[in-house]
C-alpha cells in the first residue's frame, strides 16, 4: 500500500519513519510513504501557499491552486506507476472519528492521499472538488494535520504482517474484536514487588485458565468504569457470556470490588 502525504512540513515525518517497531513497515515497503510539499507547486519567488480569508477574520487560508497542482502530480505519478487509485483524505475536526474498525479497513486498503491542513484551514473549493473523506482524531484542534497523519500511518503499519515482534500482539489491543471490543487489562512485569506494591497473585500462579479469567474480568471492569458504552456494544453483539454478565451484575452490587 502507498500513502502520499501532502504537507508543508515534510521534515516532521523524518524521525517518525525511522523510529520504533513500525519503521519495519516503512523500510520494507509494506507501507510506502511519499511526502509532497505544496510549496513546490506554488508560483512566485516566495512560493506562497496561503492568503487572507475573504470576508476578514484572523489567520490565513491555504490556497486551492498549489494544493490542486500537487494532487494532480500525485495522481499522475500513481497512474504512470500502475498504483491503484485511492481516496483523498483531509484531517479535520468535522471529520468522522478514527477508530479501530477504521484502522483495520485502512490497513487492508491500497492506501490514500493524506492532506495535512495548516493555519485556518483549506480553501473550501479545494475540499469540495477533491476531498473524498475527512477524518478526525477527536473533539480538539491541532496546529496541523501532520500528527493526525502520523497517528493513522502508525496504526496501519502495526497491523501489517511481520511488523510487530509477536504476530498476535495487536489482537490483544484495546478495541480489537479478539477482545470483543473491550479495553485491555492491566499488565505487570518484574520485580514481583515494587515499592511495597505486589503483582496480583493470580498472575504468578501458573494456572492459565484462572489467569485468562482474571484478565477477562479486569477488561470488563475497566471497560465498564471507563467506557461503559463499549460494554453495551459487546452485549448487543452477543459477546458477553452468562459468566461475564454475572460478574458485571456483582460489580454493580459491590462497586468497591472495582478499585
UniProtKB/Swiss-Prot annotation:
Its main location: cytoplasm. It comes from the Bacteria. The keyword Cell membrane does not apply. S-adenosyl-L-methionine binds at residues 117, 137-142. It is an enzyme of class 2 (transferase). Signal peptide: none annotated. Gene3D superfamilies: 3.40.1280.10, tRNA(m1g37)methyltransferase, domain 2. GO terms for molecular function: tRNA (guanine(37)-N1)-methyltransferase activity. It is found in: Cytoplasm. Pfam families: tRNA_m1G_MT. It catalyses: guanosine(37) in tRNA + S-adenosyl-L-methionine = N(1)-methylguanosine(37) in tRNA + S-adenosyl-L-homocysteine + H(+). One of its GO terms (biological process) is tRNA N1-guanine methylation. One of its GO terms (cellular component) is cytosol. InterPro entries: Alpha/beta_knot_MTases, tRNA_m1G_MeTrfase_C_sf, tRNA_m1G_MeTrfase_TrmD, tRNA_m1G_MTases_N, tRNA_MeTrfase_TRMD/TRM10. Its EC number is 2.1.1.228. Keywords: Cytoplasm, Methyltransferase, S-adenosyl-L-methionine, Transferase, tRNA processing. Homodimer. Belongs to the RNA methyltransferase TrmD family. Specifically methylates guanosine-37 in various tRNAs. This is tRNA (guanine-N(1)-)-methyltransferase. The gene is trmD.
Amino acid at each position: 500500500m502507498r500513502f502520499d502525504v501532502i504537507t508543508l512540513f515534510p521534515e516532521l515525518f523524518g524521525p517518525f519513519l525511522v523510529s520504533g517497531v513500525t519503521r519495519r513497515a516503512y523500510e520494507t515497503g509494506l507501507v510506502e510513504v511519499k511526502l509532497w510539499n505544496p510549496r513546490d507547486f506554488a508560483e512566485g519567488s516566495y512560493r506562497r501557499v496561503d492568503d487572507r480569508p475573504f470576508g476578514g477574520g484572523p489567520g490565513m487560508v491555504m490556497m486551492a491552486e498549489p494544493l490542486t497542482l500537487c494532487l494532480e502530480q500525485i495522481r499522475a505519478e500513481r497512474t504512470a506507476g500502475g498504483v491503484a487509485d485511492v481516496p483523498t483524505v483531509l484531517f479535520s475536526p468535522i471529520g468522522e472519528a478514527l477508530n479501530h474498525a477504521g484502522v483495520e479497513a485502512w490497513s487492508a486498503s491500497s492506501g490514500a492521499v493524506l492532506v495535512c491542513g495548516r493555519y485556518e484551514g483549506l480553501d473550501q473549493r479545494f475540499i469540495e472538488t477533491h476531498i473524498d473523506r475527512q477524518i478526525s482524531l477527536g473533539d480538539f484542534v491541532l496546529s496541523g494535520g501532520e500528527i493526525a497523519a502520523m497517528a493513522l500511518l502508525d496504526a496501519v503499519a502495526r497491523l501489517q504482517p511481520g511488523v510487530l515482534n509477536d504476530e498476535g500482539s495487536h489482537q490483544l489491543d484495546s478495541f480489537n474484536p479478539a477482545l470483543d471490543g473491550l479495553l485491555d487489562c492491566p499488565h505487570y512485569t518484574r520485580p514481583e514487588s515494587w515499592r511495597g506494591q505486589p503483582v496480583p497473585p493470580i498472575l504468578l500462579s501458573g494456572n492459565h485458565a484462572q489467569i485468562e479469567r482474571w484478565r477477562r474480568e479486569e477488561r470488563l471492569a475497566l471497560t465498564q468504569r471507563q467506557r461503559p458504552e463499549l460494554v453495551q456494544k459487546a452485549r448487543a453483539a452477543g459477546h458477553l457470556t452468562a459468566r461475564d454478565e454475572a460478574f458485571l451484575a456483582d460489580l454493580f452490587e459491590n462497586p468497591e470490588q472495582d478499585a
